[in-house]
Amino acid sequence: MTYTELVAAIKSYTENDYSTTDINTFIKNAEQRIHNTVQLPDLRKNVTGTMTSGNKYFSLPSDWLSTFSIAVINSDNEYTYLLNKDVNFVRESFPDTDSGFYGKPEYYGIFDDTTMILGPTPDANYSAELHYYYYPQTIVTAGNTWLGDNFD
């Protein structure tokens, strides 16, 4: 289903000629509700990055919706998956005041919508792989989307 077909279907169903702004708001809200409720396998991505020595924060991709998993990768290409914990647990368990408490991260917490906090704070640079659910581009700006093409 394309954007044009969706707008026509909304107008037909509601028997009303809403403005483009109102219809776009309706569509974006519906898309967001679906993406926040249902974890669709086709809406998963993975990225690699580096956990930086002495930095307890790890940046999330701009299209990040939620984390599926995050792992530290060692030089032998072995993965160690981090456990998700509350931010307060990470802060209290791994105080960032003494580098003697630094080590290979074992836990993460979602600090805000752009950052996760790691515990313990990395004592070296570590390769990491993040698997996550993402917000796809809205049909309002893309014209069509995975959700629109697979709505049946």
Please annotate each region the language model reported:
Residues 1-152:
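Glycine-enriched, solvent-exposed interface loops adjoining structured elements
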